[in-house]
Amino acid sequence: ATQPDFAARKDLDWTPREIIPENKKMFAALRRTEIEWRLDRKTSLETVAEEMSPLDSVCTIVNLRRHARQIADALYQSCPKNTVFFLTTDLCPAHRSRQIEIIRQRLHEGKPCRVVATQCIEAGVDLDFKTVYRALAPLDAIIQAAGRCNRNGCDQMGRVIVFCPEDSRRLYPDDWYNNAAVTVQEMSPPFSIHDPDNIREYYQRLFDGSTDKKTLTEAIDARSFAQTAAQYKLIDNTGVQIIVPYAEKRELYKSI
């Protein structure tokens, strides 16, 4: 996982220590991808689908489910349906796991595989694509997406394209995600995501711009309970749990 620059946090009462000497050389030696920054213009979702169509090992990761649906729908029109896979939290966990197993098997066998997904594919999913498209996102999310490209370190470098989706409506799930993505833009790409100095700069900018977090931290440090209460806000739990009678669990659902 991408580690934040903890050394930049002056409010911490501990100092991290680098355990790998000359880690910059390690980053360079382990580089498996080339990053193409396409942020000087907006890219339509239809264009992304068109570019994915002729590729046989490609994954596009976007920030919103409706963007994933648009790209997948376009691919269904231009590619054999059994080569297109759609992964979002609209699918129940069991369904997603089954789809991931099918994708992994197809990739292993060298069969065409075009995947459109949201962030649910970025962590804990061991898939390896030749090409990955990533909608502009926080830097750690871009690095996670790049981890799905040339994961096995083949001779040829993997290709990661970071693009800004064309959409008149919101582009990100929430304000924090938006601010973190804007921070990436403010660093004036192109730059290497494999350089620890760039990762450090990103987190420094993010920490410096997080005024709400600073205010809350200062209130806690000052033991100002009234100010802490005013600043602190729990994440709203607006989700509703549902039962999905999927696959072999369908009979169990009926029996209940």
Model-predicted regions and their roles:
Residues 30-33, 80-83, 111-112:
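A short helix-to-beta-strand connector/capping loop
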Residues 125-129:
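Conserved ATPase-coupling elements of RecA-like P-loop NTPase cores
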Residues 41-45, 96, 114:
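A conditional alpha-helix N-cap/helix-loop micro-motif detector
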Residues 28, 33, 89, 119, ...:
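Flexible, active-site-adjacent loop/turn segments at secondary-structure boundaries
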Residues 106-122, 134:
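Conserved two-lobed SF2 helicase motor
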Residues 46-55, 61, 66, 70-97, ...:
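C-terminal helicase lobe and adjacent C-terminal extensions/tails of nucleic-acid helicase motors
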Residues 2-52:
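Interdomain hinge/linker at the junction between the two RecA-like core domains of SF2 helicases
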Residues 1-3, 62-65, 117-120, 136:
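A short beta-strand-to-loop transition that corresponds to the Sensor-1 phosphate-sensing loop
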